[in-house]
Amino acid sequence: MNVEDLKKSVTNIVHSMYNFDCSEIVSLTRPPKPEYGDWALSLPLKLASLLKSPAIDIAQSIASALLELDGVQDVYVAKPGFINLKLSREHTTGIISEVLEQGSSFGRNTTQSSKKINLEFVSGNPTGPLHLAHTRWAAVGDSIARILINCGADVTREYYINNVGNQIHLFSESVYARALSKSLPKDGYPGEYVKDIARRIQCEFPNIIDLSYEDAIKIFRKRSWQIQIEEIKKSCIAFRVNFDVWFSEESLHEPDRFGKSQIDKALARCKQNGYLFQKNGAFFIRTTEFGDDKDRAVLRSDTSYTYYAADCAYYLNKINRGFSDLVILVGADHHGYVKRFQAMSNIFHVDSENNRKNVQVLLGQMVLLKNKRQSKREGNVIGLSEIIQSVGVDPLRFWFCRYPIDTPIDLDEQHLKKRSNDNPVYYVQYAYARTRSLIRSANLLQMEKFGFFPELLVHETETALVSLLYDYKTVVIDAARFLQPHRVVRYLESLAGAYHKWYDKCRIIPRKGILDKSEAELVNTRLELNRAVGQVLYNALDLIGVSAPERM
């Protein structure tokens, strides 16, 4: 019985006793002290007002039913209505065998199996290298995808290429100016990468500078962003991020055989549903009806489309591809997107409440390096490839996933390079390497297997480790439910800390070899615990795209 099974049992008990569904409010937590039991339940306090009954009476009734469950050893009730559960020794230590039997599958579940999710992240403009904030979105977005897939979801990783608009034009003009060795246009893009792109285009088209401006700029406009996207793709792959779809904004503007673009069709849908109106020669969508601070323009008076028009078409494109959930990671400076995307969900599905899609916009804070923000426009970009070369993939992915995305991060390159226990990624990876070292030592000594006796695991550090192994499934389920990979990282740090403490307190393999049968049984039992911890460390590290080194 895992935590989710225990929650279901509590839900069933309450339903049978009170004909009340408590599935949305039931939660189990670890008690503040081990002697209080394995799990604490405060549900009676929540039910008291709902059921118009004293919390202590509800607690007593639930406790009596819990005692009948397999694996529950004792149940304690404390005023004003708390319940503490103690599971049987055999039940708690059974998690070790479960981990070893399931191996890399341990922790997988089907809690998200009903969902087909489009996860859009990074989506940096193809006007320069990905910077530190993009690196953070890459680490977090890909980890969210891994966690959701682990929980049974069908996930598409998607990158939206913003290859339409003034910034693309300005970028093309900047590359063209570099090719001609001329000064940049006003608000142009500086940086060596612009010169590199110019040189590459000149190699592809040796006579391009002899062409007229009109002919040359067409080539520069197309190839500049394409070359930059090629570099972005290489950087993402090096960072262990593989997008399933690279979606071009340009495709939303392209007409079909009837002369209608995807944007045209999206706006027609808005008009059909009664949300498109004209004002001062421009067209707007009534997004204020769904909490937006103002109605959004989609077609200017000069007949050019706005970015929001493309956003509407892109949303409809995703829906037409059959996604049930849309998750979008953007920077905190895009906070206005939340209401706009929620408005789309209502506008395009006005005919059916059930067909409205779950749209989640995750807002991420900036990353600072030496207290300096990065800007392509200022030419002080530290690109993804550069930071990977300096720090490494593992430290970056671990560090960026370590914090909630709405928390600003200061990146200390030197700290992340340290091979010491105050560097979290080293601390966790070293724990895994230690588990592998013990296994190699045991194999080298040709220790005979004497069986597994979990009742021998009585040291307080062993009890702590077993409890943490038991928590893993719930951590993963919650990380998927709330789209929060930092839950996995913090769990990894807790498990690694408990393992190092156990390693230091308990002698797993005697220095002078096994002396007798009873000692051999304890050694082998501890080796099984060691293997289980190593497996869970490996599984959890994989969820955030961080390697598990055999040696360090």
Curated annotation (Swiss-Prot):
Subunit structure: Monomer.
Catalysed reactions, semicolon-separated: tRNA(Arg) + L-arginine + ATP = L-arginyl-tRNA(Arg) + AMP + diphosphate
Compartments (UniProt record): Cytoplasm
Span(s) of short sequence motif 'HIGH' region: 124-134
Gene name tied to this protein: argS
NCBIfam families with a match to the protein in the record: argS
Gene3D superfamilies linked to this entry: Arginyl tRNA synthetase N-terminal domain, HUPs, Isoleucyl-tRNA Synthetase, Domain 1
Identification of the protein by name: Arginine--tRNA ligase
Organism: Tropheryma whipplei (strain Twist)
Protein family: Belongs to the class-I aminoacyl-tRNA synthetase family.
